[in-house]
Amino acid sequence: MSPTGNYLNAITNRRTIYNLKPELPQGVGLDDVKRTVHVILKNTPTAFNSQVNRAVIIVGDTHKRIWDAVASAMPTAEAKKRPESCRDEAYGSVIFFTDEGPTEKLQRDFPALAAAFPTCAAHTTGAVQIQSWTALELLGLGANLQHYNDYVKSALPQDVPIAWTVQSQLVFGVPTALPEEKTFINNVINVYH
């Protein structure tokens, strides 16, 4: 296998899995999940080394309470289905944030680039989310990425800093079914000389 083979296989195998059970795979503990996310947060590059990425892992009663609040806020029975599934079928969720403080400081320190820094923060949080999702898949977990950001933020524990903006929720558990079949478009990559 080529030096990139394992990496590309991990990316290929990372899929959206909605059918979960609220368990961790045998031999995997919550500390493994925490350590994995921590290493990714620490080592994912950020603009000017601003280190804007943050994460909180919710499990147990906190997980159920937050997703119950999200489900309760949804206006229709159909809209409640996904947050109820997150609440009832997942083991936990990684809540991803960006800390707005470092981005605001960069905007003050480098006004000519001020408009670019929020985009940079968005790119780096996306990198953290996809890498975490891929790594959790390697641990034997299934996961799906949700974006109930404002609803989740309003239900978080009070000690989560106000300057942290919720970016997404990576809902995880043991997969109970294979992912749905994925179709691809032909993404041509041109090379110019």
Curated annotation (Swiss-Prot):
Keyword Zinc: no
Cofactor binding comment, as recorded: Binds 1 FMN per subunit.
Pfam families: Nitroreductase
GO biological process terms on file: cellular response to oxidative stress; fatty acid metabolic process; negative regulation of fatty acid metabolic process
InterPro entries registered for this protein in UniProt: Frm2/Hbn1 (IPR033877), Nitroreductase (IPR029479), Nitroreductase-like (IPR000415)
Catalytic activity: 4-(hydroxyamino)quinoline N-oxide + 2 NAD(+) + H2O = 4-nitroquinoline N-oxide + 2 NADH + 2 H(+)
EC number of this enzyme: 1.7.1.9
CDD domains (alphabetical): Frm2-like
Cofactor(s) the protein needs: FMN
SUPFAM superfamilies listed in its UniProt record: FMN-dependent nitroreductase-like
Induction section of the entry: Expression is inducced by cadmium and selenite. Expression is also induced in the presence of the mycotoxin patulin.
UniProt GO molecular function: oxidoreductase activity, acting on NAD(P)H
Keywords: Cytoplasm, Fatty acid metabolism, Lipid metabolism, Nucleus, Oxidoreductase
EC category name: oxidoreductase
GO cellular component: cytoplasm; nucleus
Domain of life: Eukaryota
Keyword Lipid metabolism: yes
Annotated compartments: Cytoplasm; Nucleus
Protein purpose: Type II nitroreductase, able to reduce 4-nitroquinoline N-oxide (4-NQO) into 4-aminoquinoline-N-oxide (4-AQO) via 4-hydroxyaminoquinoline (4-HAQO), using NADH as reductant. involved in the oxidative stress response. Plays a possible role in the metal stress response. Involved in negative regulation of fatty acid metabolism.
Family: Belongs to the nitroreductase family.
Alphabetical list of PANTHER family matching this protein: FATTY ACID REPRESSION MUTANT PROTEIN 2-RELATED
Record's protein name: nitroreductase FRM2
Organism: Saccharomyces cerevisiae (strain ATCC 204508 / S288c) (Baker's yeast)
